Amino acid sequence: MRAFDRSRAKRGEHWTGPQMSRQQFARDSFGIFAAQIAVMALGIGTSVITARTLGPSGRGLLQLLTIFPATMSNFAKLGIPVANVYCIRRRGARTSAVASNSLLLGLGLGTALALACWLGRGWLLHTVLRGVPAVTLPLVLVLLPFVVLQTFFLGILQAEQRFQEYNFQQIAPTLFGLVGMAVALLWLRAGLIGAVIVQTAVVALVTVWLVLRVHRRTPLRLAWDGPLAKEMLGFGGKSYVQTLAATLHRQIDQYMINVFLDPAQVGLYAVAVNLTNVLLKIPDATGTVLYPRLAALEEGDAHRATARVCRNTLFITAALGVGCLLFGPFGIRVLYGPRFAGAIRPMLLMLPGIVMMALYMILTRNFTSRNRQGVNIVAAGVALSVNVGLNCVLIPRWGISGAAISTAVSYSLAALMLLVVFVRESGHSVAETVLVGREEIGGYVRHARGLVPGAAGE
């Protein structure tokens, strides 16, 4: 049986321009956004528990141990998650073959990465993980194969547009994490070690569930498909540098704060980052649904869809950003207490960059869907370099506020670089891409009135 069946697209299994359903797109996006809102609410609950029980320093150490597996796993992903979507949606590859290759690659790459980190544990514990108890490192390294596998198989769910399962996989670890942290920190008083054990157990269990769900519909085989692997690695290799640079761009500031300052400052900064990143749930939700659809569209249709999604996503994100600006300081004081008041200024300083990142997250999907990852790589690489350079200057001078300024500048730069290229290649103007029209605003007003009892009939 062939790994590739390019006739699938011709039989209508792909999402084409004339068949494009805006209602279905809206439903899928809303479903993922609703799941992200649930994740946000549960995540804030977990964040409050960990912050109030561990304090700024302990919260900072937990933040480093939480983001470390996600950061390191990007060195081993090789672009496979986006390659899975591309191969299934555009190339017509059999899902079972893609999943089987992903299983073998994920286990092999994740295990090799864990061993490499263990061998370099001395350097890690004296630099980016400075202050982290050595006993917690094995618990975190065990997670690496699971984290790699999870991202590979999420790409398969995304390609098959199995968004209900995708949403459950997003919500489940946050829900289990909230319950686990409450038990470990509030009841058992297990401290940082208990929190890390909960994190490891939750990620491992959810990953096993995800693999079994994929296996149920598309049986996995311990067989290696060489030609398909070459296709996956070939496309993924182009996305690898892009994904790695983008992830480092988002997370390297927290490691640099730990190097230049101390874990307590990481804890304060983590609160600011986690609250502002709530805004990015919107472009993440729409981008997750948009990418597999763009991968099956002709270029002109893809550009039109991208411009429409960009301007609406940017509008909603900016509106919520204003809400964060007005009520965020009050929320930090009430939820986290006076010990975390130092998170307020960096939260406000990074907000403009967070809004611009919404634009970046949508535009990257357009370039990746057209096999133009080189544009994303340049933007992410330049922005990462600017971010690191600014952090080296501003963190020693202005502390975590300097890191927030660096984030705002580099995020905005990355988004503007992609916008310039998109406008040039698509023929859409800047206004068409970033500004909602009068009819679209009218639609938002009608929807808002529909949510208010008695307003719909006025």
Descriptions of predicted regions:
Residues R2-D5, Q23-P81, G110, A114-W118, ...:
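Signature of the first transmembrane helix
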Residues S7-R22, Q164, L188, L192-V196, ...:
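Interhelical loop/hinge segments that connect adjacent transmembrane helices in multipass membrane
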Residues G17, S57, R121-V140, L326-V355:
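Interfacial segments at transmembrane-helix termini and the short loops linking adjacent helices
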Residues R27-I44, P173, G177, A195-L210, ...:
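Transmembrane helical elements of multi-pass membrane transporters/channels
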Residues R27-M40, L64-L65, N74-G122, V135-P138, ...:
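Membrane-water interface segments that mark the loop-to-transmembrane alpha-helix transition
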Residues N74-A93, A159, A272, T276-G300, ...:
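Helix-loop junctions and terminal segments of transmembrane helices
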Residues C87-R90, F146-Q170, A296, P352-A379:
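Membrane-interface junctions at transmembrane-helix termini in multi-pass inner-membrane proteins
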Residues A134, P138, N167-R216, V382-V386, ...:
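Hydrophobic alpha-helical transmembrane segments
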